[in-house]
Amino acid sequence: MNLIGSYQHHHHHMMPDPFIFSPGSRCHQERPYFQGWVLNPGEVSPEFPAQPPYSPEYGAVVGPSQTSGRIENLGGKLGRRKGAPPKKERRRTESINSAFAELRECIPNVPADTKLSKIKTLRLATSYIGYLMDVLAKDSEPGGTEAFKAEIKKVDGKRRREPQPTEGYWGAAPAGEKKLKGRTGWPQQVWALELNP
């Protein structure tokens, strides 16, 4: 909002305003003194047009008690937050966030100070489910299984955007890795990218 706008200084020791010395400038000016000082007409909505502080019908100056209603109405319009979500949307967001917090607690071996995004939480949960499926599949085999590891490493943005070779997803297992029984592909690949050091 332009507070300086068309505010005119009437100090004689400063630069003179040509309007002060014009022949038609007696008691009343053509424009109200404070018009544009508080509100610029271009910044006010059409619901609240800028009106002069005097009533041309009666020739009387309008007092503050008569204009305060207009200012309060304008303040109410400008004071309201734009885009404030409704209660239903806030409750939905809180519900989703609490569900993600509960899901994060279910993933083992994640340090307490680690912040996980929603997508990382979903990927880790998917990988953990895959791990549990492998444990169930290997349960009948002698020898036991490894414990679940949730060591999180940071992956730089460039590596994340690079397309992954399809050979690692569906084809032969990379050298040094054994091919897992049952569910293979995406969850194990995500687990390898997100967690393994």
Swiss-Prot record:
GO MF annotation: an example: RNA polymerase II transcription regulatory region sequence-specific DNA binding
Residues covered by the bHLH domain: 80-132
Matching SUPFAM superfamilies: HLH, helix-loop-helix DNA-binding domain
PANTHER family, per database record: BASIC HELIX-LOOP-HELIX TRANSCRIPTION FACTOR, TWIST, HEART- AND NEURAL CREST DERIVATIVES-EXPRESSED PROTEIN 1
Tissue spec: Highly expressed in the adult heart and expressed at lower levels in the intestine and gall bladder.
Amino acid composition bias (Basic residues), ranges on this chain: 78-90
Record carries keyword DNA-binding: yes
Protein name: Heart- and neural crest derivatives-expressed protein 1
Provenance organism: Xenopus laevis (African clawed frog)
Chief location: nucleus
Triggers of expression: By bone morphogenetic proteins BMP-2 and BMP-4.
CC per GO annotation: nucleolus
Subunit structure: Efficient DNA binding requires dimerization with another bHLH protein.
Region (Disordered): 61-94, 155-184
Keyword field: Developmental protein, DNA-binding, Nucleus, Transcription, Transcription regulation
Protein's job: Plays an essential role in cardiac morphogenesis.
Pfam annotation, one family: HLH
Keyword Nucleus annotated: yes
GO biological process annotation, one example: regulation of transcription by RNA polymerase II
